[in-house]
A protein has these predicted regions:
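Short loop/turn microsegments at loop-to-beta-strand junctions
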Residues: 14, 280-282
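Conserved alpha-helical substructure of the radical SAM core
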Residues: 1-118, 122-124
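Short Gly/Pro-enriched turn/cap motifs at secondary-structure boundaries
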Residues: 272-276, 283, 327-331
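Radical SAM enzyme [4Fe-4S]-AdoMet core and its adjacent flexible, acidic
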Residues: 144-152, 159, 163-275, 279, ...
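Short, acidic, Ser/Thr-enriched surface-loop or helix-capping motifs
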Residues: 287
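Conserved AdoMet/S-adenosylmethionine-binding subsite of the radical SAM
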Residues: 57, 61, 79-198, 205-207
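Flexible mid-to-C-terminal extensions adjoining Fe-S/redox cofactors in radical SAM and related proteins
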Residues: 299-408
Length: 408
């Protein structure tokens, strides 16, 4: 390898897909379901015990920090039996070597039972639940394979998580259908007492492939936008409306990932989310068969780094190719971004969304740029105030009182 790989500048992080793209739902906008087409020649998309042990041993061994974070993702993670995750705990304990092990798992919530929740509680797992707000919004796109709505089952799952005291948060997709109702969306999460929410804008383009996939790779530039994609205007209005309620009522009580990362960038700290960081490439993904890709949103043949049976995680994640992938986030910014007053706040967002053109016709502008710019312009005075509070070692939540007094 051409560069020194230790000591590492940051912890090595690889998200794991124990069932690949296998899922009991068939959400219209899912970017991952079709990845099963990459593995048509493999009949069973499940991670073997041998591979699981190899991954856990190597993943822990490659860390230089005392805490190690494992992230289990899908597909639908709970389509592996509970015995699989009990084995995960056994192997983590076997190879921990004095380190603290943390686990988080993403699920659609429909398969949760008392038994699953007891396991998560006992082992302190953080559970992320995919839920797109109230029933009308959620069921528009999140249906099962028979075309039936999934909301009721998801809510039953959330009820079980709460009953067992499991720590959980929500991942909500903002699409063309629900983006016009930000407060309905937000009030729903407050009503179900969900204090940590990640709102993710869905942006996909259509490009049929010979193997059955139909979503465009980031390398393809002029493909048709999928109907379910949120528009830049919708995204900007959604964020501004949401922020106006949050900043007046909920700072320090409800945590919205994008608002947290925006404030972090405002004060010059790490945003804690790759989309808003200067560079990316630190979050790889490993498929059920050991294939490792640059990123969860870049699981395309052209972004495959190798396989854990042939190369180590360190070799792949610190390879020159992956370093270039991460650096390209910054290096490929068009002039309009480089000259933008809010570059520090978004850093061009996710490279997968950079298929628009600038006012000068230069390629590489983020499709959602107009929405983000509207948001940053709107929140600037509030972010400035919260930054001042943080730098004075006071609580950002003081902003709510300042607004009441008419200081802002």
């Amino acid at each position: 390898m051409s560069q020194t790989i230790a000591p590492f500048a940051r912890p090595l992080y690889v998200m794991t897909k124990p069932v690949g793209a296998v899922c009991n739902l068939a959400c219209d906008y899912c970017y991952y379901l079709e990845k099963a087409n990459l593995y048509k020649d493999i009949s069973k998309h499940v991670m073997s015990d041998e591979l699981l042990e190899k991954f856990i041993r190597e993943y822990i061994g490659s860390q230089t920090m005392p805490q190690v974070l494992f992230t289990w993702h899908g597909g639908e993670t709970l389509m592996r039996p509970l015995s699989f995750y009990k084995r995960v705990i056994e192997l983590q304990q076997k190879y921990a070597g004095g380190r603290t092990i943390d686990n988080c798992i993403q699920t659609n919530g429909t398969l949760l039972t008392d038994e699953w929740c007891e396991f998560f509680k006992k082992n302190n797992w953080l559970v992320g639940v995919s839920i797109d707000g109230p029933q009308e919004f959620h069921d528009e796109y999140r249906k099962n394979r028979q075309g039936r709505p999934s909301f009721t089952k998801v809510m039953q799952g959330i009820h079980l998580l709460k009953k067992h005291g499991v720590e959980w948060n929500a991942l909500a997709v903002v699409n063309d259908f629900n983006a016009d109702y930000p407060l309905d969306f937000y009030h729903f999460f407050k009503e179900i007492d969900c204090h940590y929410i990640q709102f993710t804008p869905i942006v996909e383009r259509i490009s049929p492939h010979a193997d059955g996939r139909h979503l465009a790779s980031p390398l393809q530039k002029d493909e048709k936008l999928a109907d379910f994609s949120v528009s830049p205007e919708q995204w900007g209005n959604f964020l501004c409306t949401l922020f106006d309620e949050w900043v007046r009522q909920d700072v320090g009580n409800f945590f919205i990932q994008l608002f947290d990362s925006t404030l972090a960038n405002w004060v010059g700290a790490q945003p804690g989310v790759c989309t808003m960081a200067k560079t990316c490439g630190h979050a790889g993904v490993m498929e059920f068969n050991g294939d490792v890709y640059s990123c969860d949103h870049f699981v395309f043949p052209e972004y495959k780094l190798g396989n854990i049976h042939e190369k180590t995680l360190v070799e792949m994640m610190y390879s020159e190719r992956q370093m270039k992938f991460g650096q390209m986030k910054q290096d490929s910014l068009p002039r309009q971004c480089k000259e933008c007053e809010f570059l520090f706040a978004c850093n061009g967002e996710c490279p997968k969304n950079r298929f628009a053109r600038t006012a000068d016709g230069e390629p590489g502008l983020n499709y959602l740029c107009k929405g983000y710019h509207q948001f940053f312009q709107h929140v600037a005075p509030y972010m400035d105030y919260m930054k001042k509070e943080l730098l004075a070692e006071r609580a950002p939540a003081n902003i709510m009182e300042a607004i009441k007094k008419g200081e802002l």
